[in-house]
Amino acid sequence: MILNNIAKTILFNPLSKDVNELYIVSGYATPTMLSWYIKNLYHKTQAPIRIYLLVGMVPFDGISVSVHEGFIHLMQDELPPEIERLECSYIYDAPAVHSNLFIWAKDGSPVLAFAGSANFV
């Protein structure tokens, strides 16, 4: 169980491995968290990474216009050299997904994964 330095353990330490993709399935997520992560990747990657974010609780709670527009804005912004691709999508049909998974991969093959209660917020 990870109790301390959760962001460092899940989002940054795996960058030292041979990975180039991060798949995030989160019940809840915010553009603020995604923006924070993008900014904090500065000089931390060995090669550009691809980030795929799937927000799961939208069928249950919906998504506010401001949050949706925040994700759109981030996807339209110019990406830093540390990020090759950024995708954000929502589950919109029931059942909602409350899982929180962080999967690091190399060219589509899983390398390391974390599951737990930490949303991407």
Locate the predicted segments by residue.
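PLD/PLD-like phosphodiesterase catalytic module centered on the HKD motif
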Residues: 1-121
